[in-house]
């Protein structure tokens, strides 16, 4: 009986610790979005980051989920206009059933919708993975009005993401970040 009480106390303390460590408060500059955001918890988890004490996180909260959730940040194109940009960041996953990843979208005129978009659906993060660096590269056209970036979880599982950067890149690239050179390079593999 005493052992059962100790196990119950331990379980309660562990649950309290998890609730304290995982704060599903949306961080400044970010917002929660998606087709089924109420089926997920999203926010910040202390002590879970790759390079800092905190990491962004999205976690399914129900067994049956009919859509996705994303943690999103939007900003004006400003200095990125007419440039190629690269979103890079680190993500790890636990028990992701459908897919997860970063996404980058360039919205603009004339339609007001997406001029360019990549959500890694063609190279999804699935299952349980360690910290891995991912990249997305897109062109920001002259008629861009907004850049939207974030992390996405579609279906059951949990993801953590950290150390996200947006960089201007000089080399022409395709949407997956592969450099497209003006001519052949390093054909003898010496560079």
Pin down the residues of each PLM region.
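Bacterial N-terminal signal peptides
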Residues: 12-21
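Extracellular and organelle-lumenal recognition/adhesion modules and their flexible linkers in secreted
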Residues: 23-191
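Bacterial N-terminal signal peptides that target proteins for export
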Residues: 2-13
